[in-house]
Amino acid sequence: MNNDETIDTLNTLIETAKDGEYGFRASAQYLSSPEVKQIFARRADACLQATAELQSLVVGMGGYAEDTGSAMGTVHRGWMAVKGTLAGYSDRAILDEVERGEDSALSSYRKALEQPLTPELRSVVERQLEGVKRNHAQIRALRDQVRSEAA
């Protein structure tokens, strides 16, 4: 993999991390649970840290680091807003949509690891993937908890 391809791969992950940050922050404002709002704020901060780390790597490689999320992430957040307006912003619906976003993040990180990265970059991407997995598991557990409370 040449330098430009590696930078493209990292920039895709930057967009993914920015999507996560924006998604957690946007979703938090509609949640009813203060505890879940705090969890979302921490998740957004973790995504912001992941973004900064990836941006630093891209700049260190002589590339231009993305500083926005993806078009698909913007569409997903827009869909969440429309769906929330039509169906109401229930914690369950929000958690369902955030989990869908985390599914997408998992896919992006796994795809990046299919690329021939340097050992240093692979280590960073693997570590960040573990964070995405933790986010996903936590969101799923919260969603399941909300479902069981509603039953």
Where are these predicted regions, by residue range?
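Conserved alpha-helical segments that form or flank metal/cofactor-binding pockets of metalloenzymes
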Residues: 38-73, 139-142
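Charge-rich, acidic-biased intrinsically disordered regions
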Residues: 38, 45, 65-82, 122-130, ...
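A structural signal for well-ordered alpha-helices, especially hydrophobic packing surfaces
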Residues: 21, 51, 55-58, 79, ...
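Preference for long, well-ordered alpha-helical segments
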Residues: 98-151
